[in-house]
Amino acid sequence: MISNRRWMVAAVLGVALLAGGRDAYSQEKRAYKIGSVFSVTGAGALLGERMKMTVEMMVDQINRSGGINGHPVKLIVYDAASDVTKAVAATNRLITQDEVDIISGAGNMSGLSLAMKPVAMRHGVPMISNAGARPIVEPIDKSSWAFKSHLTDKEIVGRAIDWWKSKGITRVAMLSDTSGFGTSARDELKLQAPGAGINVVAWEEFDAAANDLVPQLTRIRAANPEVILCWTVAPSGVVFMKNARQLGMKQILMHGFGYVVPKYMEMAGDAAEGTVLVSLRFPVGRQLPDSDPAKKVILDYTREFKAKYAQEPDVYGAEAYDGMLMAFKALEAAKGFDKEKIREALERLNFVGTNGIYRFSPQRHYGLTKEDAVVMEWRNGDWKLLMGAETK
């Protein structure tokens, strides 16, 4: 006859085994939760719209193919409305209420990503930004949970300087907005210009919501630069192009990678013709040589997006595409839900995306280099490649 004590031990073990079985079953069926914060309204809406569409398409595709390591993927997306406060609130909600395993898509604007970063750091949740400002991932000892699918403004500014030097240009003016995006690039040009023999003859700033840049451009005209580099993602960049041509300015007009949006060029009309931009590979993907490893990824993504939405993707959607690839690959490599292992997997990534060859390390939380950037021109309603992306 079984004693009461032995019966109780057996009962406890039985309950534990049942609980363990339920936990194992629960773990087997548990979905990976990926959070995204994009601005699909507000000043950054033109950037965020196709980013959101892209990640929704990708999650649908991976779930139809069986998920990641047999786990389904759940995507949770919030609109930051181009507002820092809303971006931070959305990040807190993703982490504390939705309990996401990773964030891929951090605001789609540098200022928003910079505001979201401390939240991810505080909670120990991997965050992948699609924005450009260098401080998103540096210094590395204060960016352990922050990664990005984009170049930093260090490489983009460096690529602009390469093009200036190839054309014998030495006199440049910079007109940047006062956001984190504009300020970061301004600081970068200050660092790089002197050593490259570039004389920045005028520094001007403007509010991202500005609708008149004539005063700044009048001062720039007096300094007689060869090129005017504007740095913004806001519609005020259209005002820059229109005002410059209205003033009869003949200088080369140039935008950074925040303005690779055909809609913005169309809004500027004839004033945009000949504008030079520094960008990631995607907009000129069809013009890349077949030997470029990113070309096939670009064409495949473009075909998939057009098949689903009956419209063309853009470079911002491509950035979100590469960012979500990062998330998928890291989750697959981590083989579980341990956020530290997911973070470590991100540091080991090496893959080809739409915008180049990504190589990450514990010391480098963005995978692209200056050679992944291109210089292009808006000509006759399309992008024309001026300086290509070298294969690493």
Listing of model-derived features with the role each one plays in the protein:
Residues 2-14, 20, 24-392:
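Extracytosolic ligand-binding ectodomains
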